[in-house]
From Swiss-Prot:
Keywords: Ribonucleoprotein, Ribosomal protein. Coiled coil: none annotated. This is Large ribosomal subunit protein bL35. It comes from Campylobacter fetus subsp. fetus (strain 82-40). InterPro entries: Ribosomal_bL35 (IPR001706), Ribosomal_bL35-like (IPR021137), Ribosomal_bL35_CS (IPR018265), Ribosomal_bL35_sf (IPR037229). The gene is rpmI. Belongs to the bacterial ribosomal protein bL35 family.
């Protein structure tokens, strides 16, 4: 049986920790002038993948 291959785009976007999967925040690429500084600071922080999406992400990462 051949090796399982992960989705390369997903492998670049997600980091796997002990029990959770980390992801970066969205809404940070363009049209940034109208967004407040506090929101921009908050968006810099990484977040965890929601429980509804964990199984799909794990399947993409072959976990």
């Amino acid at each position: 049986m051949p090796k399982m291959k992960s989705v390369r785009g997903a492998a670049k976007r997600f980091k796997v920790g002990k029990n959770k999967i980390k992801r970066g925040s969205a809404f940070r690429s363009h049209i940034l002038t109208k967004k407040p500084s506090k929101r921009m600071r908050d968006l810099r922080q990484s977040q965890y993948v929601d429980s509804t999406n964990v199984s799909a992400v794990k399947k993409m990462l072959c976990i």
